[in-house]
Regions:
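N-terminal "mature-domain start" segment
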Residues: 21-84
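A short acidic-to-branched-hydrophobic micro-motif
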Residues: 83-117
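C-terminal motif of bacterial Sec signal peptides marking the signal peptidase cleavage site
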Residues: 9-13
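Short, surface-exposed beta-strand/loop micro-motifs that present aromatic residues
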Residues: 79-97, 147-148, 156-162
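Short, low-complexity, Pro/Ser/Thr/Gly-rich segments in the mature regions of secreted, periplasmic
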Residues: 185-198
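Short Gly/Thr-rich strand-loop-strand
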Residues: 118-157
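N-terminal export and membrane-targeting signals
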Residues: 1-4
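A short, solvent-exposed beta-edge/loop patch
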Residues: 145-188
């Protein structure tokens, strides 16, 4: 389904001046107040949380690998999945996924992120089924953000991630139409998940 993160990327090499400008265009200041991630009951107020154990297991494994990127212990964490269908209950799976349903995997945490760019490099380093990864606008919360697309067993995947001084997360859209980018949905999801610490 989704390639699991298995290691860190040591970022090396030279860049051209144009590369730097492109990357900087997709970077904005990180929030100055401490942030946390909160799990909504319905994603974007429309998609229910899945109870499919295999989806949750994948999200939790990705979360475990993201924890290695923090400078210390996480202050909050999310590792879950949302679906665009309600589903029919099957005891052996938890839920049955009808044909045409799409899934959103979310793996993210808050804590100390000392270098958001290097952290995001590491988060994307082993997502080998993504054929294109490019910077994207991070939205009003700032930091670094990028999205990549690929295929897994004929299913379209778009993975987007962000890192700022307080949070790092991956949002993976599985089975959505390839013709439409999920970058706007990604920014809306981030705005729903990332909130100031109270």
């Amino acid at each position: 389904m989704v390639v699991l993160l298995t290691g860190l990327l040591a970022a090396t090499g030279c860049t051209q001046p144009g590369d730097t400008r492109k990357s900087e265009a997709q970077t904005a200041p990180s929030p100055t107040t401490a942030m946390r991630l909160d799990k909504p009951k319905r994603l974007l107020d429309r998609w229910p949380e899945s109870v499919d154990r295999s989806l949750h297991k994948t999200a939790q494994q990705n979360l475990g690998n993201l924890k290695k990127l923090l400078g210390g212990e996480p202050t909050s964490a999310i590792g879950t999945a949302y679906v665009t269908w309600e589903g029919e209950y099957l005891p052996e799976r938890g839920w049955y996924r009808p044909a045409g349903g799409s899934t959103v995997l979310i793996s993210g945490l808050s804590g100390t992120v000392s270098d958001p760019r290097a952290t995001l490099n590491a988060a994307f380093a082993n997502l080998t089924r993504l054929t294109t990864v490019a910077p994207t606008a991070p939205g009003p919360l700032g930091g670094e953000a990028r999205c990549g697309t690929g295929q897994d067993k004929g299913t379209h995947i778009e993975a987007c991630g962000w890192a700022d001084n307080h949070t790092v997360a991956l949002v993976t859209f599985i089975g959505f139409p390839a013709a439409q980018s999920r970058a706007d949905d990604f920014r809306q999801v981030r705005s729903q998940l990332e909130n100031p610490v109270r």
